[in-house]
Amino acid sequence: MKAKEMQEKSVAELQATLIELLREQFTLRMQKATGQLAQTHLLSQVRRNIARVKTVLNDKAGN
């Protein structure tokens, strides 16, 4: 998801997206720990998406 798309969402939608991404990150970390994760690049993608959502949330809180 692009930052432009996130800026158009409401705060509630962004918070829901953040929770979803955190759950996905947890699942991926557990899969990596048990050796089931073949696509390790997904971890960094999810981490960056979490950072994007948090950045947009902080921008909206500042306004």
UniProtKB/Swiss-Prot annotation:
The keyword Ribonucleoprotein applies. This is Large ribosomal subunit protein uL29. Coiled coil: none annotated. InterPro entries: Ribosomal_protein_uL29, Ribosomal_uL29, Ribosomal_uL29_CS, Ribosomal_uL29_sf. Belongs to the universal ribosomal protein uL29 family. One of its GO terms (biological process) is translation. SUPFAM superfamilies: Ribosomal protein L29 (L29p). Pfam families: Ribosomal_L29 (PF00831). Signal peptide: none annotated. One of its GO terms (cellular component) is cytosolic large ribosomal subunit. The keyword Cell membrane does not apply. GO terms for molecular function: structural constituent of ribosome. Keywords: Ribonucleoprotein, Ribosomal protein.
